[in-house]
Regions:
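A contiguous pocket-lining binding segment that forms or flanks enzyme active sites
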Residues: 130-167
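Active-site- and interface-proximal helix/loop "cap" or "latch" segments in soluble metabolic
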Residues: 187, 280-327
Length: 327
């Protein structure tokens, strides 16, 4: 199995390398970090629905739509990427989904613990410190390969992430940022700025390579050879094009944004006989934490407060029942 320890690379190469490796049907582990900040969205997402594209343009932030799942995320040099590419028929892939995630998140947890951070796997594919998220991940199938990617977070810019998010108004954006600041953590937060800064990228890459080798077997250092570079150029011509990046999907009236495992912010628009009703609510593990309604005589079958602690399903059914009759 090859180890591609690329270090600091262009933002484009930080995504194109693992896509190209998978399209070639080659296996390996890639370790890298982007030289410039950018925003990445998941395969099933449309940037126009997820991001404030005007803000991204003003800030000079490129947008990349990847071929693996997960949500929109702000990425920069303070995050070290690990990218696993395996053939679909590899023995390590023949597991149920949760077992696969747990197996390949174990090395990331191992690195954090080696640094004195009490991290663990938060079902099904997050890494957390006492429920505070400390790594993002995404997975998918590319060509004949399964790809699992994620990061080791030195620090995370919650303000920058909140600004790139498409939000109905500043209040929603502020709420999202406040939740992130409470519910996300990083090496900087856990170890302190001085201790985190004393860790070199090379040291962290070395820890990642060592921990992943305990799962993947011997990892032989390899470089970006000519075949892989040519594949990156081919993949780049497609994936860096506006046609790929900004592919449109059916507009969604209802939206939820992930903060960490189990914790979501929801924005729901519902037509009613009196006019459009807007609902905002926060959920934890499928239960409503808080909810507010806006709109003409917006009223649910029960008092709004009675939905707190109940299931998200009950609340959304009540909202859907506001729809005008088709008779």
């Amino acid at each position: 199995m090859h180890l591609y320890r690329l270090g600091r690379v262009s933002w484009q190469d930080s995504q194109l390398a693992y896509h190209a490796l998978a399209h070639l049907g080659r296996q390996g582990l890639i370790l890298c970090s982007p030289a410039e900040p950018y925003v990445s969205v998941g395969y099933f997402q449309e940037p126009a629905q997820e991001l404030d594209l005007e803000h991204c343009r003003r800030q000079g932030l490129p947008v990349f739509r990847r071929e693996v799942g997960g949500g929109a995320v702000y990425l920069d040099q303070h995050q070290l990427f690990w990218q696993v590419v395996l053939k679909r028929d590899h023995p390590l892939v023949s597991l149920n989904r949760e077992a696969f995630y747990r197996r390949f998140l174990a090395p990331v947890v191992g690195v954090y613990r080696a640094l004195g951070v009490g991290a663990g796997v938060a079902p099904i594919n997050d890494v957390a410190v006492e429920r505070r998220r400390i790594a993002g991940t995404g997975a998918g199938e590319i060509g004949d390969c399964v790809v699992f990617v994620g990061n080791l977070m030195r620090r995370f810019d919650c303000a920058a992430m909140a600004q790139v998010l498409r939000a109905p108004d500043p209040e929603f954006r502020r709420s999202y940022q406040q939740y992130m600041e409470r519910e996300l953590t990083s090496l900087r937060h856990e170890l302190g700025d001085q201790q985190q800064a004393a860790l070199s990228d090379d040291e962290l890459y070395g820890l990642l390579a060592h921990e992943f080798a305990s799962v993947m077997g011997s990892l032989v250092p390899h470089h970006l050879d000519d075949e892989l570079r040519r594949a990156m150029e081919r993949v780049g011509r497609r994936m860096l094009s506006p046609a790929w990046t900004y592919q449109t999907r059916r507009a969604r009236l209802h939206r939820k944004v992930k903060v960490r495992a189990g914790l979501y912010l929801h924005h729901w628009l519902q037509e009613s006989p009196q006019g459009p009703v807007e609902a905002r609510f926060t959920s934890l593990d499928g239960k409503v934490l808080e909810v507010s309604l806006r709109g003409p005589v917006a009223k649910l079958p029960r008092e709004t407060s009675e939905y707190i602690g109940g299931s998200v399903t009950d609340l959304t059914k009540a909202l859907s029942a506001m729809a005008p009759s088709r008779d």
